[in-house]
Amino acid sequence: MKHAGPEALDALAHLVAALRARGLKEPRPGIFYRKGKAWLHFHEDKAGLFADLRLGSEWERFRVSDAAGQANLLKLIDRSLARAAR
């Protein structure tokens, strides 16, 4: 499974825009950092588009090929950001 290229990121444009709106650092397209560490990035594969999100010390993979998967990822991200803000 390879990192998402420009075409894959174009397919995720609304999701990526929502992440940027949350103020996450994006040193390279589609790769987001939090507290100086890689926190979220995307992959593309024959099976679809996926996001790897660091929850705690482990990476977890989420399918983001459709609107439901993208909404689920944003909920997880919002919860994580809210916990960190406390």
Stretches with model-predicted labels:
Residues 1-86:
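Charge-dense, helix-prone N-terminal extensions
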